[in-house]
Amino acid sequence: MNVALFDFDGTITTKELFRPFLEFAVPSIRLRWGGLLLAPMVLGYKLGVVPSNTMRASAVRLGLQGMDEAHANEQGRRFAHEIIPQAVRDHALERILWHKRQGDRVVVVSGALDIYLSHWCRQHDLELLCSELESHRGRLTGRYRGAQCVGAEKRRRVHAAYDVDAYPVVYAYGDTHEDRELLQMAHRRYFQWREVA
């Protein structure tokens, strides 16, 4: 048995789904208000001054803080069933199925939020390591539980959950600099669906 590690946004999907999820789950008045508050940070992000993880943390805080956890989970379930399938690359699903037919362990390793990605992975019988939202007394706190699962954190999470040295071949699939450490773990690396050395 080998192991295949897949990034989600931009690798399995055609686009980043963080913002579409917030637009789907967050009430429109709060979304507009949050957009105004985040406008300077968005500009900084586009100029390369504000890191993506800082941008995501601020958007989570403004969009999801105080939301009922059960309601948020239901929104995540609906998003996974109604929106994600429209963004999934056919060849990505084919590759996942190819690995499963080989008897490989298939793990999605993503900075995407557990609140929706867990539903999609469960639906496709895939293991998951991803960014998790913190809750307290049935409400989302607007913070991540632990570090966002990007960059070096992807490698750390994989090593904490799996003995990668026990697998004859480790495959990894990614599409951005946030996947570099994930790709470095693998014998067979695919960046933007092209095999790289």
Language model features by range: what are they?
Residues 1, 74, 81-197:
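C-terminal cap/substrate-recognition subdomain and adjoining C-terminal extension
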